């Protein structure tokens, strides 16, 4: 659990960064353009349900809190049940045209932002910008012509599965020399998949 001060400090640093960004010259079109590469379509397909629609639901989960708390007398595990938002896994399909005539490498970054404000009014991009959250970030190779990039939500580099969010550090520890050990030692940073 994070100290409440963390969030205040994080907000303060964000504000300083935004003040700095407002003093910079706007990016030029040349800086923002990727010559020869055009995104021609984007689609989000859930495992079930209509295309371009997130299927969300409430779910209850149990978590062991005893690793993050000190007790005067040993009491065993302390578990808590909490209700959280979850979603059906989905797949991004991005259609890209590479008219450069050569194979190109690119970085795909996917963000989620609100489309409308609390009154239902469509938001301007400059207002959405501060509310965006990165959903995924990955490198792709694009051959000349039309390309379809597919990526499952569970493959995201910025999210972690629920099991690694609240895992036990004592149980199932693999041998020191295996690839599984590197995976086990993963820092656990990232947004939970279920968010």
Curated annotation (Swiss-Prot):
Enzyme nomenclature, EC number: 1.14.18.1
Molecular function terms from GO: metal ion binding; tyrosinase activity
Bound cofactor: record note: Binds 2 copper ions per subunit.
Residues that coordinate or bind Cu cation: 10
Catalytic activity: 2 L-dopa + O2 = 2 L-dopaquinone + 2 H2O; L-tyrosine + O2 = L-dopaquinone + H2O
SUPFAM superfamilies: Di-copper centre-containing domain, E set domains
Compartments where found: Secreted
Residues bearing glycans: 77, 97-98
Stored InterPro entries: Di-copper_centre_dom_sf, Hemocyanin/hexamerin, Hemocyanin_C, Hemocyanin_C_sf, Ig_E-set, Tyrosinase_Cu-bd
Keywords tagged on the record: Copper, Glycoprotein, Melanin biosynthesis, Metal-binding, Monooxygenase, Oxidoreductase, Secreted
Factors inducing expression: By infection with O.dukei and O.ochengi.
Cofactor: Cu(2+)
A biological-process GO annotation: melanin biosynthetic process
Pfam families (UniProt xref): Hemocyanin_C (PF03723)
Gene Ontology CC terms, in alphabetical order: extracellular region
Role noted for this protein: This is a copper-containing oxidase that functions in the formation of pigments such as melanins and other polyphenolic compounds. Catalyzes the rate-limiting conversions of tyrosine to DOPA, DOPA to DOPA-quinone and possibly 5,6 dihydroxyindole to indole-5'6 quinone.
Subunit structure: Heterodimer.
Similarity comment: family membership: Belongs to the tyrosinase family.
PANTHER family: LARVAL STORAGE PROTEIN/PHENOLOXIDASE, PHENOLOXIDASE 2-RELATED
Protein name: Phenoloxidase subunit 1
Species name: Simulium damnosum
């Amino acid at each position: 659990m994070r100290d409440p001060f963390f969030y205040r400090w994080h907000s303060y640093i964000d504000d300083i960064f935004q003040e700095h960004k407002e003093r910079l010259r706007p990016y030029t079109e040349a800086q923002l353009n990727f010559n020869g590469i055009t995104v021609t379509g984007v689609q989000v397909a859930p495992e079930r349900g209509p295309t371009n629609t997130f299927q969300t639901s409430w779910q209850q989960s149990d978590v062991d809190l005893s690793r993050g708390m000190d007790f005067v007398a040993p009491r065993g595990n302390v578990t808590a049940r909490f209700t959280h938002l979850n979603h059906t896994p989905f797949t991004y399909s991005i259609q890209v045209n590479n008219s450069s005539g050569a194979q190109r490498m690119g970085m795909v970054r996917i963000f989620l932002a609100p489309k409308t404000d609390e009154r239902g009014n469509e938001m301007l991009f400059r207002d959405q910008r501060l509310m965006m959250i990165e959903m995924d970030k990955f490198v792709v190779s694009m051959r000349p012509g039309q390309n379809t990039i597919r990526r499952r939500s569970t493959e995201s580099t910025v999210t972690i599965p629920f099991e690694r969010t609240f895992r036990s550090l004592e149980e199932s520890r693999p041998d020191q020399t295996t690839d599984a050990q590197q995976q086990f030692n993963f820092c656990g940073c990232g947004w939970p998949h279920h968010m």
